[in-house]
Regions:
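A structural signal for small-residue-enriched, beta-sheet-centric alpha/beta enzyme cores
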Residues: 9-14, 21, 27, 181-187, ...
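N-terminal amphipathic/basic-hydrophobic helices that include classical n-h-c signal peptides
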Residues: 1-7
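Generic N-terminal targeting/processing segments that precede catalytic cores or assembly contacts
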Residues: 8-181
Length: 313
């Protein structure tokens, strides 16, 4: 159901006995900024807030910043609020500029472009083709539909160009998964629902899958997988592999095995600490301690099955 007029400060999820506030995505920021810029260009009036509908069915009332406009273009920004999610893009400004296009553009068509701080795709396996801006399919649709609706409301029979950019996006991107995914020069404009759910396990496992998919579509039949730093340090320091040789799966070993099957990989090699991997011997495919432990019990059981003495066990 749609929650009309609700503010993100009023939306929470409870995880691990904590009350965590939801946020909204860079895609939602891009849509809101584009809508506001279109309103200012078409109406020649400053806009302070816009109401947008997210794919999740939640309406947001977002503040518009850095506004300026002329008769030919309008520029503004929306500040990303990630809620209580530990997101390095929290607080960034996502800018949009809407300009009237020249005669070579079909009337009423929205041309979406990317500028500074928005990454470019350099490898196969992602939603966009090599060389294209890293603006995913859902945000592209959100931005285009929002601007097309304002064109229609204003009765304007001209095409427009929409430019999205993020100051400091290139620097921020170094702290994200983008370098490992083959996205260079900036962050991605993301979000299938338009909403950020704090501490989302699905968001993490989806990112792991995308990283494996990129490797598979760029010719990799086998993949190294590590839960964390123990495994990656061993591959780098002891075996001499590059630091990004392996996919980090955190505690989601079962999911990464499923991903490998889904992608028709020939095999994966798990590299990590015995304290993690001994759990796999008991079929524990999520290795987080809150899911299950039993490490000593697993050792004892397998020692018994191997014929170990009572004293040993």
């Amino acid at each position: 159901q749609r929650c009309a007029g609700i503010y993100m400060e009023e939306m929470y999820v409870y995880k691990n006995q904590q009350k965590l506030r939801w946020g909204y995505t860079t895609g939602t920021c891009g849509m809101a900024a584009s809508m506001a810029a279109a309103l200012m260009l078409f109406g020649q009036k400053r806009v302070s807030h816009v109401k947008v509908s997210t794919p999740k069915g939640i309406d947001l009332d977002l503040e518009i910043e850095e506004t300026r406009f002329t008769k030919e273009q309008a520029v503004c920004a929306v500040r990303k609020d990630s809620g209580d999610d530990p997101d390095v893009t929290n607080g960034i400004l996502v800018y949009a500029r809407v300009t009237f296009a020249q005669d070579d553009v079909v009337k009423s068509k929205v041309i979406l472009e990317a500028g500074e701080g928005v990454g470019r795709v350099t490898q196969k396996g992602l939603e966009q083709s090599i060389g294209d801006p890293a603006i995913n399919l859902v945000p592209r649709r959100m931005i285009r539909e929002a601007v097309e609706e304002e064109l229609q409301k204003a009765g304007i029979d001209r095409g427009v160009r929409v430019m999205i950019w993020v100051p400091d996006g290139a620097e921020i991107a170094k702290k994200t998964f983008n370098p490992k995914l083959g996205i260079e020069g900036g962050i991605s404009i993301l979000g299938t629902t338009g909403i950020v759910e704090p501490m989302s396990e699905k968001a993490l496992t989806d990112t792991i899958f995308v990283e494996m998919k990129v490797r598979r579509e760029n010719g990799m039949d086998y993949c190294y997988v590590v839960p964390g730093n123990y495994g990656s340090d061993f591959l780098h320091d002891t075996l001499g592999y590059q630091e990004d040789a392996a996919v980090k799966c955190s505690n989601y070993v079962g999911e990464v095995i499923d991903d490998a099957v889904r992608l028709q990989m020939k095999g994966i090699l798990l590299v990590g600490h015995i304290g993690k991997f001994i759990k796999l011997a008991a079929g524990i495919m999520n290795t987080h301690s809150r899911q299950a432990d039993g490490r000593m019990e697993i050792l004892a059981a397998h020692a018994a099955m191997a014929g170990g003495s009572r004293e040993l066990i």
